[in-house]
């Protein structure tokens, strides 16, 4: 009970603490019915996300991105994204998916660069922020929700590596959440279907 009371007092103090200011322009409203602006909208969302962390307006953000739209107005893309994910191995469809995913990942890379440039207490904000990026499908072509591709950046973990696991007897996805909770200082040994922490994920 005492720990909970301390959390309430800390939250109240945080509300009264002066927040950093920004000179960033106010985001302009975009019409999502126009498929040409989806990538720009993603850029806006990442900009707002970064500013929220920089200003200490929040410490936790969840962002869901949906590419289920009419064909994006990107060079080389002629079909809508959802149909392309059911590619059936078609080289043409896979090539178009690559164009879309490269455009989206370029914006994600910009988010990481922005967090790396921003400073908090003398350290890059990225070093003090865990950023988990992933998909709701391991293979959208077959609606297979196993073997999710995930990217974890920042947070003081050792990066620059690719961890792969047995596809038939895989490591539970929830293990990475246990590792992240422990990095946050939450002494949790279990989350959902986890059976430990994420093997191979170490602190820098």
Question: What is each of the regions a protein language model found here?
Answer:
Residues 1-204:
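Ligand-binding pockets and gating/stacking loops
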């Amino acid at each position: 009970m005492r720990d909970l009371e301390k959390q309430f007092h800390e939250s109240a103090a945080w509300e009264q603490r002066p927040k950093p200011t920004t000179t960033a322009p106010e985001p302009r409203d975009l019409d999502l019915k126009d498929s040409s602006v989806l990538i720009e909208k993603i850029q806006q969302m990442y900009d707002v996300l970064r500013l929220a962390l920089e200003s200490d307006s929040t410490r936790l953000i969840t962002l869901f991105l949906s590419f289920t739209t009419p064909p994006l107005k990107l060079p080389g893309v002629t079909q809508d994204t959802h149909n392309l994910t059911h590619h059936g191995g078609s080289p043409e469809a896979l090539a178009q998916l690559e164009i879309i995913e490269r455009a989206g990942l370029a914006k994600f890379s910009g988010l990481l660069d922005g967090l790396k440039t921003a400073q908090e207490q003398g350290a890059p904000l990225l070093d003090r922020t865990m950023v988990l990026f992933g998909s709701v499908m391991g293979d959208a072509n077959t609606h297979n929700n196993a073997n999710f591709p995930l990217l974890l950046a920042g947070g003081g973990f050792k990066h620059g590596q690719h961890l792969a696991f047995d596809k038939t007897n895989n490591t539970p996805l929830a293990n990475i959440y246990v590792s992240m909770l422990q990095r946050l200082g939450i002494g949790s040994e279990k989350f959902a279907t986890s059976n430990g922490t994420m093997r191979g994920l170490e602190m820098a």
